């Protein structure tokens, strides 16, 4: 049995995010005419070749320029970007839906912009509201959301968008409390198992002084709100770019399932009858989306391995069969299930899955698992599979 693998991922470790050098001479200022006659100021950043697009809304006390660094990094990795200027003095009824639709339609109408794969990012109360409302109005095209330091009344949309990848970011030193709690509400209301929360902690939250959208300048900026976080946390733009690369280029509309986001499913797996229930949920989810995932491979695999360590091979097999159903091309999942079949007396199945693990490793067609593909870990899987086959060889 392989030792327990505990991996802690921190979204705030800059070493995990590759820095993307900004690209020069890709931006042009544009005027976008809204359906209500309003002229929206914007800046369009064109990628060198066709690719997805990202629409970025700024917070009320900043301008579209606050997103420029992110936009340039997006262009460098092949993603078109549009930053748009919104009027913080306008009410939602005045902005929605005409201004939002105009910005969205401008983005997807640009040469080289994939109109079917779009991401949206927003900062502050107004930016987050505009982002969620735009995603609601264009749910078929919007494949990813990034929300910084805001809130929205559209909680029902986040609850219903069960497969929309969402990245939430907030900081305790945000000068407009209770933004952290508002962002946490958005996160716990959202139902996507691939959603993530980047939370910059402090010993105390900032004191409440005034509301964000009103009387701009009354509250001194402290660097903890919206795109202001980029200065104090220089890795954050890279985290956002990496998120859009994953959800718009590598696996459009999908991100790896997150343990915290899928906590209810993980807990359900550990309850009596839970494996069968989650198995059915996964089958139903796959009917709608063949790429749907309800839980991370390594987290559920650890539950199965815990059963093995407790001398409960039948329970281990039950859980690990679910893991393999979710991740059928994982050499790791095949080898771990083979380890469980062996003490359960199912020798032929143990042989089959050990051989499948080796075949997957030898093909070099896919990563060894969904969570890691290092040569060291591939070696661990290989040694485990070969050990099982040796144990099954007569006379060994």
Question: Each predicted region: which residue ranges?
Answer:
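Active-site-adjacent alpha-helix of alpha/beta-hydrolase-fold enzymes
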Residues: 75, 169-217
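Active-site glycine-rich loops that stabilize anionic/oxyanionic intermediates
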Residues: 49-51, 58-62
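N-terminal cap/lid segment of alpha/beta-hydrolase-fold proteins
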Residues: 23-47
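The serine-hydrolase catalytic nucleophile loop
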Residues: 60-71, 86
